[in-house]
Amino acid sequence: MSDDVFTLGPAAFGSRLIMGTGGAPSLEVLERSLIASGTELTTVAMRRLDPTVQGSVLSVLERLSIRVLPNTAGCFTAGEAVLTARLAREALGTDWVKLEVVADERTLLPDPIELLDAAEVLVDDGFTVLPYTNDDPVLARKLEDVGCAAIMPLGSPIGSGLGIRNPHNFELIVERAGVPVILDAGAGTASDAAQAMELGCAAVMLASAVTRAQEPELMAGAMRHAVEGGRLAYRAGRIPRRHFAEASSPVAGRAVLDPERPAF
């Protein structure tokens, strides 16, 4: 869909699938999955990354010409997230950051107060901030108001595979947003990615759904097609939901029996 470019901050992408790298069984499987997904933007967790190591995730992304998106996974306070983002900028030479500030290790749900504080500091510091957030339309608006380049609500908890539990909130967020809305967590299979796009999301971000699948490369390809299909369906416009049937065939030309001349 070369006529449907995905614009995110100052950059444009042909693919609307953003991949994560966590949970891959090996670098070889990860590389094949990234190729199958067609992604052009992939996240890496700074706390698990050593840029000096040869044969790392970074070398795979460089070989595939995929843009690196560092994230602040594992941060519980705004201060930790800001420090991690600044270290990433120094180490990787990018001012893009996928901002994650979670409340606890059990749920990995975003801490809205710490998240908003960190977002405001990083935007003021010149970062292109992509925040992982709750599916809360009010918080989404506040994140956009402080200057975030996108809103990335979760469909369900990270790694849960439960899909989008509150599609109505996604519709509200999309309807009010002036920046791209990206599904950021919860996808378990291709239909979840397609649903996100049909709800109006500009892109889908996922990792576990691919890296922990029985066949990661196959699932990556499925996700690619699901995102593309869901986007086409959204652009095409679905038919209205109705309580009763509506015939698709015209009435004109229908055979009508003459009661005085039985057919048999």
Swiss-Prot record:
CDD domains: ThiG (cd04728). Keywords: Cytoplasm, Schiff base, Thiamine biosynthesis, Transferase. Its EC number is 2.8.1.10. It is found in: Cytoplasm. It holds the Pfam family ThiG. 1-deoxy-D-xylulose 5-phosphate binds at G159, A185, G186, A207, S208. Homotetramer. Forms heterodimers with either ThiH or ThiS. HAMAP family: ThiG. This is Thiazole synthase. The lineage of its organism: Bacteria, Bacillati, Actinomycetota, Actinomycetes, Kitasatosporales. The gene is thiG.
